[in-house]
Amino acid sequence: MTDLKTIIEEAYQNKDNFTTDTVPKKIHQAIHQTIELLDNGELRIAEKQNGQWNTNEWAKMAILLYFKTEPLKTFDAGYTFFYDKIPLKYTNNTSQPQSGVRVVPHAIVRKGAYLAPNTVLMPSYINIGAYVDSGTLIDTWATVGSCAQIGKNVHLSGGAGIGGVLEPLQAHPTIIEDDCFIGARSEIVEGVMVEKGSVISMGVFVGQSTPIYNRQTQEITYGRIPAGSVVIPGSLPSKDGHYNRYSAIIVKQVDEKTRSKVSLNELLREG
């Protein structure tokens, strides 16, 4: 994989020197090999190592090169035709059952996204570079953006959106860690991290500029929701007191033992 990384990095530095028609065969093959590694889960855009998330920038480079070098083409989706650069993930009748993933009609997964066994897709959309781990449910009309990392046993409720982050290359993707619940119509975007075991209420919107207020500590932070947080939508007064600004409010933090004994609705109502 080291050789592949070197080829991709060098190609990205010279990406303006070739087009769909002129891309060298060696680079074309390296791009496709990288996309295949992402597609089968051997390579991830981001990995947690020693408690820290690290981004594989070269894998992002490969995706951007894939967009640049692939021609638009028509392909058959069974009930209709699409015209795009990136094919769908499941292209034959044998690959889907072998994957161990349940895919309800009208769910869309692009090539280069990985779904672990025992995941369930209701009619939803999973973009290239995304990683969805085992036991996770992607509910109706939920979207998982490019390169987003979704942990084990996560529930993305109806209409929830997890934003994609391809550029800048060094930016972390949006990350939802294991055992999280993301409420209906909530949006987690711009590389925000929701740590393990957190519960996000319906209609919570969190980007890098969204204040995250911890009711217990009275601290305001940005870009990260700590493990075990129970979060609801709210607002904070402006500095001049003339208006209120939308905020995500951490009403409490719970451990796994508490969460296992208490329903999600109870946790949110107690806030």
Curated annotation (Swiss-Prot):
**Location within or outside the cell:** Cytoplasm
Listed pathway(s)? Amino-acid biosynthesis; L-lysine biosynthesis via DAP pathway; LL-2,6-diaminopimelate from (S)-tetrahydrodipicolinate (succinylase route): step 1/3
Q: Could you say which enzyme class this protein belongs to? A: transferase
| EC numbers | 2.3.1.117
Similarity-based family? Belongs to the transferase hexapeptide repeat family.
Q: Which gene encodes it?
A: dapD
Q: Name one GO molecular function term.
A: 2,3,4,5-tetrahydropyridine-2,6-dicarboxylate N-succinyltransferase activity
Q: Which reaction does it catalyse?
A: (S)-2,3,4,5-tetrahydrodipicolinate + succinyl-CoA + H2O = (S)-2-succinylamino-6-oxoheptanedioate + CoA
Source taxonomy: Bacteria, Pseudomonadati, Pseudomonadota, Gammaproteobacteria, Legionellales
Organism of origin: Coxiella burnetii (strain CbuG_Q212) (Coxiella burnetii (strain Q212))
Q: What is this protein called?
A: 2,3,4,5-tetrahydropyridine-2,6-dicarboxylate N-succinyltransferase
One annotated Gene Ontology cellular component of this protein: cytoplasm
Give GO terms for biological process. Answer: diaminopimelate biosynthetic process; lysine biosynthetic process via diaminopimelate
Keywords for this protein: Acyltransferase, Amino-acid biosynthesis, Cytoplasm, Diaminopimelate biosynthesis, Lysine biosynthesis, Repeat, Transferase
